[in-house]
Regions:
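Long, domain-scale functional regions
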Residues: 1-325
C-alpha cells in the first residue's frame, strides 16, 4: 500500500487516489514543478484506527465510548472523503447496532443533505416499506435517476423532488465498501422526554406501532436520534439532558451534526402510524414527531465494510481520511 507525498512550487498539488494521478490547482507561476514521493505504509484498518483515538482530542471534539466509539463536539476531525465528496464519521459500532456478527463497523453520514424528501409518501411510519428507504437503497445506491421511480417526493405524492442521483449517488467504485446491515426500527411513545441513552435502547427495542417492522436490512439508512444526542460535547451538555431540550448553545451549539435545518431520523413514534422523530432547525429532537409525508432534509447513513482501511489524512476538513478496501 502506498501513500503519496506531493510538494509543488508555483501551485498547490494533491494526489487523487481515486484516479491515481496528480491534481494541480491555485497556480501562481508559469513555471510549476512538483515532486511526488510514494511511501510504502502498513495497512491500518479504519475501525481499529478510530478506536485507538479513544479520549484523544480531535479538532474541537474527541472520541468517546458511549454505546459505541463516537465523535462528539462542535467540529471534531471526523471528515472522510467518500464517494468523491465529504462524509463524516459517526463512530465505530459492534453487532448490537448493525447485526454483523463479530465485526466493528465504521458508520458514516453524508456531510450535506440530499434534498427535502418525504420519509414516506403514504404518510405511514414503517421504514421497511417507506418510499425513502426504497429511494436510498435503489436509485441513490445505484447512482441512477430516481425522479420517476415512484419514490421521489418532496411532500406526500403531490410534489416530485429532484432525485437524479447519476452523479450524486453512490458511484460504482465505492459500493463494494458498503456493508449490508440490520437497521433497528424500534419506536418510542414520546409521552415523556428521553436522553441519548434512553433513545439508544428504544431504537433497538421492539415497541412499534401495530404492524410495523422492528428491523430491516439494507445498505443505506438515516441517523438515529441517539446519534445526534451523543454528538454533543458532553462537558458542555450533560448526557442526562433530554433531547427535547437541546435547543441551546451548550447543546446543539456543541454538536457537529447540527446545522443542516430540519432533518429526518430513522426512528418512528410507536404511538401512531404516521409520526417520525425529526431534528428541528433550532437543534432539538421534535418530541411529537413529524408527519412522514413532509419533505425534510435527508442525509444518507451507511456502514463501511470491516476491511476498509485508511491510507491518508487526519480527519480534518483540509485533510480528510482517504480510504480503500
Amino acid at each position: 500500500m502506498y501513500k503519496a507525498q506531493v510538494t509543488c512550487a508555483g501551485a498547490d498539488g494533491r494526489w487523487l487516489y481515486d484516479d491515481w494521478k496528480l491534481a494541480i490547482e491555485n497556480i501562481t507561476s508559469d513555471d510549476v514543478t512538483c515532486d511526488i514521493k510514494f511511501e510504502t505504509i502498513p495497512k491500518t484498518y479504519l475501525n481499529d484506527y478510530i478506536i485507538s483515538l479513544l479520549e484523544s482530542e480531535q479538532g474541537t471534539g474527541k472520541v468517546v465510548n458511549e454505546n459505541g466509539y463516537r465523535y462528539e463536539g462542535k467540529n471534531p476531525n471526523n471528515y472522510i472523503w467518500f464517494n468523491n465528496e465529504y462524509w463524516r464519521i459517526i463512530g465505530v459500532f459492534d453487532s448490537v447496532s448493525h447485526g454483523v456478527s463479530g465485526k466493528n463497523l465504521v458508520k458514516i453520514i453524508r456531510a450535506e443533505t440530499l434534498d427535502g424528501l418525504a420519509w414516506n409518501k403514504s404518510d405511514t411510519n414503517n421504514w421497511k416499506t417507506s418510499s425513502l428507504k426504497s429511494l436510498l437503497n435503489g436509485a441513490y445506491y445505484n447512482a441512477q435517476d430516481g425522479t420517476s421511480s415512484g419514490y421521489c417526493y418532496g411532500y406526500s405524492t403531490t410534489e416530485t423532488a429532484n432525485c437524479d442521483y447519476t452523479k450524486r449517488g453512490i458511484q460504482s467504485g465505492y459500493r463494494g465498501m458498503i456493508a449490508s446491515v440490520t437497521w433497528h426500527l424500534g419506536g418510542y411513545s414520546s409521552t415523556t422526554s428521553a436522553t441519548s441513552s434512553a433513545f439508544y435502547g428504544y431504537e433497538r427495542g421492539t415497541t412499534v406501532y401495530s404492524g410495523n417492522a422492528t428491523s430491516t436490512t439494507g445498505y443505506i439508512g438515516l441517523m438515529y436520534p441517539s446519534d445526534y444526542g451523543y454528538s454533543v460535547l458532553s462537558s458542555s451538555c450533560a448526557r442526562k439532558t433530554d433531547l427535547w431540550s437541546y435547543s441551546s448553545g451548550t447543546c446543539a451549539g456543541q454538536s457537529w451534526l447540527y446545522g443542516k435545518g430540519y432533518e429526518w431520523t430513522l426512528t418512528p413514534s410507536s404511538s401512531d402510524s404516521y409520526h417520525v422523530f425529526s431534528l428541528d432547525d433550532e437543534g432539538y429532537v421534535n418530541g411529537n414527531g413529524s408527519s412522514a409525508s413532509i419533505g425534510y432534509g435527508s442525509r444518507p447513513v451507511l456502514y463501511l465494510d470491516a476491511s476498509v482501511y485508511k491510507i491518508d489524512g487526519d480527519g480534518s476538513l483540509n485533510n480528510p481520511y482517504i480510504v480503500r478496501m
